[in-house]
């Protein structure tokens, strides 16, 4: 009747079809879950320096340094379909040149086996908070937002924003010392 290769091909095709159906069922079982969490964020020790921006032609730029406290519980997000979270803190503000400026100042990968309740105190920025001009000084509406990507085992990569945002006014004078 059928030779060995034909039977192996049929078995492999059926197995792949069943695995695809199970993967789709896994995705559909978690697609409608709510992945938003609330956080408690405090930003303090904000200092702004006017530095030379070597990436542009002899222009000055504002460099902000700050520390923040973050408390958030991600434990309810980890179901069987969540592999890990990519968590990052974004500073958003408007300037004369750009309607929206978004700067990622800190990030962390949170895996299932790690601590999923974050209680960070006095964390410094991981990346430079550099504005391409002098728009940070005296800015009264810099919004800090915690966002995270939910990385699943099966399904699409979900971008989620935390429910709480923090609006912070920036200092009115530059810091002149070299120490942060």
From Swiss-Prot:
It is a single-pass type II membrane protein. Keywords: Endoplasmic reticulum, Glycoprotein, Membrane, Signal-anchor, Transmembrane, Transmembrane helix. Residues 1-12 are cytoplasmic. Residues 34-180 are lumenal. GO terms for cellular component: signal peptidase complex. One of its GO terms (biological process) is protein targeting to ER. This is Signal peptidase complex subunit 3. It comes from Caenorhabditis briggsae. The gene is spcs-3.
